[in-house]
Structure formats: C-alpha cells, structure tokens
Amino acid sequence: MFDILMYLFENYVHSEVELLVDQDELTKELTRAGFHQSEIIKALSWLERLADIQEAGTPYLCNHDQQSFRIYTKAEMEKIDVESRGFLLFLEQIKVLSVETREMVIDRVMEIDEPTLNLDDLKWVILMVLFNAPGHESAYEQMEDLIFEQPDGRLHS
C-alpha cells in the first residue's frame, strides 16, 4: 500500500501532473503499473480518509494546550520508532508541524498496513499530510527543503 501512495505522490502530486479524478481510471493506471487490486483499494481509501480529514471543516483536536507533551500509545510506539518520534518532536519545535498536523500524521501512519514505518517513509507521510492541509504551504515547503536539500560544503573540518 505504501508503495502505491509513494507512486501517486511522486508521479502525480509532487510532479504537478493533474491527478486522474476518476477512481476507476486511476485503478486501471495503477494496475498497469504492476500494483495489486487489494493494495490499490487500500491506498485509495487511505487517500480518501486524508481528504476527509482536511475537508471536515471542524478542528482535528478540541481544547488542546499548545505546551502539552504527546504521550504515544503502545501501538503507536510499536509502529513509530524512537528516531521517528524524535523527528516529529523536532518538526513541532521548528514549527513545521502544529499539534493538529502532528496528529493528522500519526493518524495516517497508523492506517498504513505495515508493522513499522521507518524515518524516510514517515517523511513522505508528513509531506502528503502537509500538501493536503490548507494553509500549510509554508510548512510543506520547509519539509521539502528538509528532505531534498543537501547541505552545502563540509559539515566538519
């Protein structure tokens, strides 16, 4: 399923090619690309739920304190390793993620049908969430820079 999400993001969304609106046509395209029907359905459902979260028009979280600290459930800790949880905290500290977008990311990660998700995969989920979150264009650009920009020059002398 995650491979399909990556394929769609890289070939349609990130490359700014118009995404096929017709789900049947998109399913056929993904089948021609070599993906299995059951995985295609899961990926498209995942994307629909992401869109539903964005379009709900109601706050994703109610009455939260901006200074609160996120405690992960056992299932979340099993799926999101320490390095990835640290990266989420880092992104909050530098204001790339808000409390709401962090929770959206965790929600989307937990719906991916993989037992664990590595840091590189988490970064792509974050990009997908920020891309689909109205008003977070700047955060999306910052996240893109963190992923794609390579540091100039030597890091150590």
From Swiss-Prot:
Pfam families: DUF494 (PF04361). HAMAP family: Smg (MF_00598). Belongs to the Smg family. This is Protein Smg homolog. The lineage of its organism: Bacteria, Pseudomonadati, Pseudomonadota, Gammaproteobacteria, Alteromonadales.
